[in-house]
Amino acid sequence: MGFEVVDWTGGLAYSGDWNHIGWTVAASRRPISSSLLAFGGAKDPNTGITWGGVRATGVSLSASYDRGEANGVWADLSAHQITGKNVADNQRQRLMAGYYYKLINEDNRRLSVGLNTMLWHYQKDLSGYSLGQGGYYSPQQYLSLSLPVNYRQRTENWSWELGGSVSLSHSKTDSQRRYPLQGLIPDSLPDKFAVEDGSSSSGVGYTCGRSSNAVSVRTGRSAPASIFNRRRTIRRATR
């Protein structure tokens, strides 16, 4: 496909139930696709060194509780080692959890509200694109809280959904070397030992969207889904 770094990815998962709690444990090696550098790698024109192709290898445990009644909860815990070709090694831990309450809980109609939270931690900030960096978002602290609202309904021929959320988030990155793998950088480069300052930011955002699908009873064919999404984020950054 023309990528500079090509290797294997995959995963295994096993699911079960315990006291009405559904759970899944998984082990995987997955590509990080947040940039072309992270996903497929790049070649430095000055040194001829190839770097990038970042992969996350680790385990995750997810669980959920929903007996079809008004309340439901879910959680996901994961830990990964993040590596790449000529990219500094990194570690990632993530905890995500949520609660939802069904204000309307009928066979063909449902309205739910909830509270979701995410807590991420990366050992290093390797979000840059210089030699040795990974080109992926990797804050040392990331915390978000969101309040989702979702309504869905179906009839004999139609189904549609409306949803939206309001969220608060905060992130922090530590200072980092511009070139984290010093052995790759020639001594003649004037900024070989340069350091990028850390930063912190807080933000408020919202999402809203709708989707619908028309189904022909006589032919069994589905008309194309029409999806409209709108997103806006307001952020405040400090250094």
Where are these regions (language model features)?
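Gram-negative and organellar
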Residues: 1-239
